[in-house]
């Protein structure tokens, strides 16, 4: 193992030292940021004095619950003041009032806390204080998480430097730096009782693993499928947390995870004779492309119609038109995704075209959902897909006289 890293790590001493120093600084930044955030969130609150009672109005736009929800959060607002009250679904159904009397308390360090009752306990004060501080310090936590993932990115490019070109390393690290910046500027809000910090962690992991997987595919490396398994696990977690994109979640469970394992085996059996790290790739015939397009259209209509008829609680509140649009876009994305998975399994160049379509459809969903950090991932998709398509095309052209490049009828 040590000999492997010695043979593949960055050969230029100056650059290698610089990358190690950057990794150490990122690690320190991550520890300091997360440590500071945890210290603030878990700080003991000695006392909280009552300030005043306030009438707050219920914000119904943030509500979309069904019997599947055991806990229903209702938000009340008054200017910039906010109170979130958790109800059981049974109590939520019978909740008719659009206003509530909130009680404002202030801690010894000036933090304002709001409750729906007086005579609060120390445990209630501590819990509310922790939630408020976690929301305030979300950019700090996001920076700490992103710095740690960025450190791993730098180390990968250092330890496997000889496996990547300068362009590939620059592309990979640029996307991760951009994701770090976006995660700090646009922190995620909580959803379905899950703190926005956890959601951002999933987004950053999804970005990191996806672009690494994309890069390995463009290099015709079978190891992309090992990374892809981690991608599927993260994306399933995202679907569960946000309660959305159910077509994608089912497709991931029943199709992508099995196809990743099978594809790894298949690619391992078709190594390039001259370069064992490469896998032999090829392309489709025209009529086969038409059949694929027809299949995608049929899948989109059938699956979209089926899921739109289900009574499922989503993270898009009460906007029925938006929910339906997301369902059909997601159905189309899942159809293209399945085609993409088969293209990758059969080592077909057309998988890059499928990547283009998937990236566009998912970018639309990300914009609608306000998932801005994932737009960085889509930017990475578009740029690397172009790179991968050109790279595979050159390989196919150079081997056209040696190997069959089209699937026989």
What do these predicted regions represent?
Residues 4-44, 149, 153-220, 257-259, ...:
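Polytopic alpha-helical membrane-helix bundles and their juxtamembrane interface segments
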Residues 107-143:
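Short, aromatic-rich amphipathic segments at membrane interfaces
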Residues 74, 82-86, 103-107, 111-116:
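Short linear proline/tyrosine/threonine-rich motifs used for host-factor recruitment
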Residues 218-270:
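Hydrophobic/aromatic-rich structural module bridging two neighboring secondary-structure elements via a short loop
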Residues 62, 66, 76-78, 95, ...:
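Acidic surface patches and DE-rich sequence motifs
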């Amino acid at each position: 193992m040590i000999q492997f890293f010695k043979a593949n790590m960055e050969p230029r001493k100056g650059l290698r030292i610089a990358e190690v120093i950057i990794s150490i600084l990122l690690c320190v930044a991550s520890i300091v940021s997360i440590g500071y955030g945890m210290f603030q969130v878990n700080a003991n609150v000695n006392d909280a004095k009552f300030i005043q009672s306030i009438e707050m109005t219920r914000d119904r736009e943030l509500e979309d619950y069904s019997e599947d929800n055991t806990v229903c959060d209702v938000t009340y607002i008054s200017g910039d003041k906010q109170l979130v009250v958790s109800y059981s679904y049974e109590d939520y159904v019978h909740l008719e009032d659009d206003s509530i009397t909130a009680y404002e308390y202030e801690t010894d360090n000036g933090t304002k806390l709001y409750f729906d009752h007086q005579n609060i306990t120390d445990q209630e004060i501590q819990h509310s204080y922790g939630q408020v501080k976690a929301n305030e310090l979300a950019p700090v936590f996001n920076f700490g998480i992103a710095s740690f993932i960025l450190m791993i990115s730098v180390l990968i490019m250092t330890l496997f430097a000889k496996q990547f070109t300068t362009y590939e390393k620059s592309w990979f690290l640029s996307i991760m730096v951009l994701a770090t910046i976006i995660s700090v500027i646009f922190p995620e809000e909580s959803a379905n009782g899950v703190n926005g910090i956890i959601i951002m962690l999933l987004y950053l992991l999804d970005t990191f693993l996806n672009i690494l997987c994309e890069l390995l595919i463009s290099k015709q490396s079978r190891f992309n499928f090992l990374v892809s398994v981690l991608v599927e696990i993260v994306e399933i977690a995202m679907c569960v947390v946000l309660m959305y994109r159910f077509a994608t979640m089912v497709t991931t469970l029943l199709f992508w995870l099995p196809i990743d394992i099978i594809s790894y085996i298949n690619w391992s059996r078709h190594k390039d004779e001259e370069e064992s790290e490469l896998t032999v790739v090829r392309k489709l015939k025209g009529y086969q492309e038409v059949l694929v397009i027809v299949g995608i259209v049929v899948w989109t209509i059938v699956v979209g119609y089926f899921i739109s008829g289900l009574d499922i609680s989503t993270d898009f509140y009460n906007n029925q038109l938006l929910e339906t649009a997301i369902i059909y876009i997601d159905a189309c994305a899942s159809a293209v995704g399945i085609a993409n998975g088969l293209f990758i399994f059969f080592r077909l160049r057309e998988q890059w075209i499928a990547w283009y379509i998937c990236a566009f459809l998912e970018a639309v969903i990300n914009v609608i959902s306000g998932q801005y950090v994932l737009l960085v991932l889509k930017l990475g998709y578009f740029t690397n897909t172009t790179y991968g398509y050109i790279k595979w095309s050159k390989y196919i052209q150079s081997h056209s006289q040696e190997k069959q490049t089209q699937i026989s009828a």
